[in-house]
Amino acid sequence: LGDVYKRQNMDRRKFIKTAGLAAGATLLSGIGLAEVTTEKTKSMKIVVLTGSPRLNGNTNHMASQFIKGAEEAGHDVYRFDCTRHKVAGCIGCNACGMNGDCFMQDDFSELRPHLLEADMVVFVTPMYYFGFSSQLKAVIDRFYAINGRIKGAAKQAAFIMAYADTDPKEAEPMVSHYKTLLNYLGWKDRGMV
């Protein structure tokens, strides 16, 4: 039984990695990153927030493929691996006033200037108990400190998710969260995979 599981798991992983390449290409074409460069406009500054602790997992593989395509299209990409950085969740103290510095001294201070300058933010996460990974969620919660500067800003966003299920309904809570976040921030959705 163990050998059967390993073979099925490896087949599934191979399929997902291959599908990740196709999905990345689909997302890139749906987002229009290639067209942006040919329209004689400046390249975009893109922040990719990854939320998977598995370096060689499907989520990070899809993120890498997206980044590769975006860079080949001439865009400037900054990758922030939420699981490799120490970012505490927001405690709601309001010391930042939603438009200032957060009193917590951690790796969010490294990400902050990139988020403020970004034309696009890409959220990449595995599904953990029908939600974003806790590491990515902690980073999103810290958006509170820069809310006054990113809400209503002319930013775009995309969502890339991996999950081990065949029922699309299982992804609905995460898709809903992503759409609600973008609606609140006033950002334009450029695609979901």
Task: Indicate where each model-derived feature is located.
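N-terminal export signals
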Residues: K14-E35
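N-terminal beta-loop-helix "entrance" segment that forms/cooperates
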Residues: C82-G100
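Helix-loop-strand module that forms the ligand-binding subsite of alpha/beta enzymes
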Residues: F103-L185
